[in-house]
């Protein structure tokens, strides 16, 4: 955040980094739209711990972004939105969702629940990001919004997200954090022994 009489050096590396962020968000939206094309119909839903985890983490991200705006710390607002989008939604939740959507053992209720959380989380994330990157979020939202049940003509006509304390789930966060630690540990062991990702190993 630049103040008066303070100059910031233009950093092309940061520009490239945010270009990569835009690409990451675009690809995430494509994955969500492709994964939710097949309608599971109305009915009961079952949420996995990972579905509950991302809903819980989204509330924390919303609170952090809103606090950044309230304090006129637009840098902190952008950082909170960036970190949730990249490190939690894209890097982890999208991968977790594949274990439900691509498994023959998953029930219709499980797939229905994961698909709904995918769409609702992305739609909320787009509204959260909109003040920071209005054009791209509007473009994606025009396709995602209707699937999430939104009827406004523009993302600008929809309310800005507010954190919902009822969706904070400490148990899901604890379980998912342990799962992430195990996965990272296995990846580290693979790297230490030069085991290719394609090689299946007993755990």
Predicted regions and their residues:
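Catalytic adenosine-cofactor/nucleotide-binding cores of aminoacyl-tRNA synthetases and other
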Residues: 1-45, 146-151, 192-201
């Amino acid at each position: 955040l630049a103040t008066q009489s303070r100059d910031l050096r233009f950093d092309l590396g940061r520009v490239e980094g945010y270009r990569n962020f835009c690409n990451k968000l675009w690809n995430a939206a494509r994955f969500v739209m492709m994964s939710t094309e097949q309608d599971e119909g109305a009915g009961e839903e079952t949420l996995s711990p990972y579905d509950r985890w991302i809903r819980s983490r989204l509330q924390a991200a919303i609170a952090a972004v809103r606090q950044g705006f309230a304090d006129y710390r637009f840098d902190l607002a952008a950082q909170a939105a960036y970190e949730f989008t990249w490190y939690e939604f894209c890097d982890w939740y999208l991968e977790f969702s594949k274990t439900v959507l691509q498994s023959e053992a998953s029930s219709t209720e499980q797939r229905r629940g994961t698909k709904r959380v995918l769409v609702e989380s992305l739609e909320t994330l787009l509204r959260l990001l909109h003040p920071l990157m209005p054009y791209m979020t509007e473009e994606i939202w025009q396709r995602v919004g209707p699937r999430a049940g939104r009827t406004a003509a523009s993302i600008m006509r929809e309310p800005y997200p507010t954190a919902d304390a009822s969706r904070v789930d400490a148990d899901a966060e604890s379980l998912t954090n342990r799962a992430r630690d195990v996965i990272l540990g296995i990846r580290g062991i693979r790297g230490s022994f030069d085991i290719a990702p394609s090689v299946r190993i007993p755990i």
